[in-house]
Amino acid sequence: NVACVHRTCDSNCKRNGYKSGKCINRKCNCYPH
């Protein structure tokens, strides 16, 4: 399993139309859902 990198997570979420991304338990979570 790949460790979550906040910068990558955040930009992936933004590219998918979310406001921001945050790493929780090594997984990328996009907000707001």
Swiss-Prot record:
<dbReference type="GO" id="GO:0090729">
    <property type="term" value="F:toxin activity"/>
</dbReference>
<dbReference type="Pfam" id="PF00451">
    <property type="entry name" value="Toxin_2"/>
</dbReference>
<dbReference type="InterPro" id="IPR036574">
    <property type="entry name" value="Scorpion_toxin-like_sf"/>
</dbReference>
<keyword id="KW-0872">Ion channel impairing toxin</keyword>
<comment type="function">
    <text>Inhibits less than 5% of human voltage-gated potassium (Kv) channel Kv1.3/KCNA3 currents at 100nM concentration and does not block human Kv1.1/KCNA1 and Kv1.2/KCNA2 currents.</text>
</comment>
<feature type="site" description="Basic residue of the functional dyad">
    <location>
        <position position="22"/>
    </location>
</feature>
<keyword id="KW-0800">Toxin</keyword>
<feature type="disulfide bond">
    <location>
        <begin position="9"/>
        <end position="28"/>
    </location>
</feature>
<feature type="site" description="Aromatic residue of the functional dyad">
    <location>
        <position position="31"/>
    </location>
</feature>
<feature type="disulfide bond">
    <location>
        <begin position="13"/>
        <end position="30"/>
    </location>
</feature>
<keyword id="KW-0632">Potassium channel impairing toxin</keyword>
<keyword id="KW-0528">Neurotoxin</keyword>
<protein>
    <recommendedName>
        <fullName>Potassium channel toxin alpha-KTx 10.5</fullName>
    </recommendedName>
</protein>
<keyword id="KW-0964">Secreted</keyword>
<dbReference type="GO" id="GO:0015459">
    <property type="term" value="F:potassium channel regulator activity"/>
</dbReference>
<comment type="similarity">
    <text>Belongs to the short scorpion toxin superfamily. Potassium channel inhibitor family. Alpha-KTx 10 subfamily.</text>
</comment>
<dbReference type="GO" id="GO:0008200">
    <property type="term" value="F:ion channel inhibitor activity"/>
</dbReference>
<keyword id="KW-1015">Disulfide bond</keyword>
<dbReference type="GO" id="GO:0005576">
    <property type="term" value="C:extracellular region"/>
</dbReference>
<feature type="disulfide bond">
    <location>
        <begin position="4"/>
        <end position="23"/>
    </location>
</feature>
<dbReference type="InterPro" id="IPR001947">
    <property type="entry name" value="Scorpion_toxinS_K_inh"/>
</dbReference>
<keyword id="KW-1220">Voltage-gated potassium channel impairing toxin</keyword>
